[in-house]
Amino acid sequence: MAAAATTSSHLLLLSRQQAAASLQCGLSFRRQPGRLAGGSSAPSVRCMAAVDTASAPAATEASKKSSYEITTLTTWLLKQEQAGTIDGEMTIVLASISTACKQIASLVQRAPISNLTGVQGAVNVQGEDQKKLDVVSNEVFSNCLKSSGRTGVIASEEEDVPVAVEESYSGNYIVVFDPLDGSSNIDAAVSTGSIFGIYSPNDECLADIADDQNLDQVEQRCIVSVCQPGSNLLAAGYCMYSSSVIFVLTIGTGVYVFTLDPMYGEFVLTQEKVQIPKAGKIYAFNEGNYALWDDKLKSYMDSLKEPGPSGKPYSARYIGSLVGDFHRTLLYGGIYGYPRDQKSKNGKLRLLYECAPMSFIVEQAGGKGSDGHQRILDIMPTEIHQRVPLYIGSVEEVEKVEKFLA
């Protein structure tokens, strides 16, 4: 009787365990004879994986589409490092830049509250009035790059000359940036942004420098090494401060878009391998300067206003912020242009830290960047704050303006 009870209990317990195991891990069971303590036989269980080929792909697909699965910028950078696309130093530099962008985003959003609107009272090297946020954003960007310990030289729109941030330049990256593009619109809460590009150090810039205020020969060589064509860029991107904070990045393998999640304080991947349309019906030019343009450019602009095969002319969209206008062009197609004119003989935008990074991004997305005659990325800078005309956007649209200007 006791033996029967023991057998019954064992079978009940065994059946419950089998059921639980089957539900939890989808395994199949095969009963084999075994022995109980009393000498009677009892079934034992052999566990084998049961593969349902029909449901496996569906399960994999479901896991990919999980609404709770997110990829942060940090995770994405680590994956790129593991794949050998970038090294550990580049990962740290890009993480530092993203931190700077988060801080600047907060400053921009709170600018009216923190009394950061208006003019600082100083003039930068370009002869432009510095906004309060220009100065603060430049300091934030510079400090984040310095604290990374992986940046050798930085060149900013707000600095007269490149700044050495480490005792030794060997193996450290060169970062060029505009800390706050479109700052003239900040008082009106219009979209602004930060632009950056990352270069590898030049072989001529591999020595320690003396700690003095004057530029010695080594520093001069390092400054020269900053002036590289955009074709040498290793990474480029921008962060747009608007209704959302958008971080756009390329490391030479396509264009990726990350959106700042205010709940977690993390940039989250929202678009991969962005491709700009081959053509577009939107143009972004400051037509207030029309009278200052040459006749060829006027003819081009007039052609955009004529009804095309569809019976509709191009649409004009101009924010006055390079980052804002470029981001729309990247997503919708079309062309953004800031040409030379009678007032600005070489254009207004800076080659090193505005035109080159944006052109690198647009080419990675299948678009084109030109000064009207040649590829932006092929132009060798002769000085840090060199200006060039810029026509950037869909391939067909940029080639169209090049034909008019030829």
Swiss-Prot record:
Catalytically driven reaction(s): beta-D-fructose 1,6-bisphosphate + H2O = beta-D-fructose 6-phosphate + phosphate
Binding residues for Mg(2+) 3: 178, 181, 354
SS bond partners: 222-227
Protein location: Plastid, Chloroplast stroma
Keyword entries, A-Z: Calvin cycle, Carbohydrate metabolism, Chloroplast, Disulfide bond, Hydrolase, Magnesium, Metal-binding, Plastid, Transit peptide
A single cellular component GO annotation: chloroplast stroma
Pathway membership, UniProt: Carbohydrate biosynthesis; Calvin cycle
Protein residues bound to Mg(2+) 2: 157, 178, 180
Enzyme Commission identifier(s): 3.1.3.11
Molecular function per GO: fructose 1,6-bisphosphate 1-phosphatase activity; metal ion binding
Induction of expression: Light activation through pH changes, Mg(2+) levels and also by light-modulated reduction of essential disulfide groups via the ferredoxin-thioredoxin f system.
PROSITE patterns reported for this sequence: FBPASE
Gene3D superfamilies reported in the protein's UniProt record: 3.40.190.80, Fructose-1,6-Bisphosphatase, subunit A, domain 1 (3.30.540.10)
Regulation: Inhibited by sodium chloride.
GO biological process, one term: sucrose biosynthetic process
Other facts: In plants there are two FBPase isozymes: one in the cytosol and the other in the chloroplast.
Family: Belongs to the FBPase class 1 family.
Function: Catalyzes the irreversible reaction from fructose-1,6-bisphosphate to fructose-6-phosphate and inorganic phosphate, to regenerate the primary CO(2) acceptor molecule, ribulose-1,5-bisphosphate. Involved in the regulation of photosynthetic performance and sucrose synthesis.
Cross-referenced HAMAP family: FBPase_class1
Protein name: Fructose-1,6-bisphosphatase, chloroplastic
Species annotation: Oryza sativa subsp. indica (Rice)
